Regions:
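A polyanion-binding, active-site-adjacent surface
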Residues: 1-192
């Protein structure tokens, strides 16, 4: 377990634990405030993220930024965003179980350094890996569950919302619940 962000990111960028390293342009380590008390976890980088080296910078990321801004959150101020896998799966497919396992240590180390009070899983893959393997995201999104002293919630992935705009109001409700929970716990570092 590495004890500081710079060492962890440097080590992660040298990772060759699975085949995804063969086709990556960049390791997409994570973005945000390393003192945040809320961590959003996605599944893995897409093409734009791989090219730029930052999570959620494509169309889905732009929509995520709108959702965040609507509840007074921002990727540079009061949250941190990594992914389950740090390298892009080919053709934007879901990361395979062995790829997730090869990469999960990086996320665990990020989690240990951040020590968030709330973890939000963006989409099915992250929710299945971190909350429970049989989660039904379309039914269980927006519900908080405590696991090892951390409140966890799944929400619909921003890319899924772009494909199914009728689900946007439900996702927005999830973000409102998150904001309310953050205010209850006093865990918004931007507010004090």
């Amino acid at each position: 377990m590495l004890q500081n962000w710079n060492e962890l990111e440097t080590a992660c960028k040298d990772c060759r634990a699975c085949g995804l390293c063969e086709t990556r342009h960049h390791v997409v380590f994570g973005v945000g405030n390393p003192k945040a008390k809320v961590m959003f976890v996605g599944e893995g980088p897409g093409e734009t993220e791989d090219l730029q080296g930052e999570p959620f910078v494509g169309r889905a990321g732009q929509y995520l930024d709108k959702l965040l801004a609507a509840v007074d959150l921002g990727r540079k101020s009061n949250i941190y965003i990594p992914n389950i896998v740090k390298c892009r799966p080919p053709k934007n497919r879901d990361p395979l179980p062995q790829e997730q396992e090869a990469c999960i240590g990086w996320l665990r180390n990020q989690f240990a350094l951040l020590r968030p009070k709330i973890l939000v899983c963006l989409g099915r893959v992250a929710a299945m890996k971190l909350i429970k393997p049989d989660i039904k995201i379309t039914k269980e999104h927006g519900e908080f569950l405590e696991k090892n002293g951390v409140l966890m919630m799944a929400t619909l992935h921003p890319a899924a919302l772009l494909r199914n705009p009728n689900q946007k109001p439900a996702a927005f409700e999830d973000f409102l619940k998150l904001r309310e929970k953050m205010d209850q716990l006093g865990c918004d570092i931007a507010k004090g």
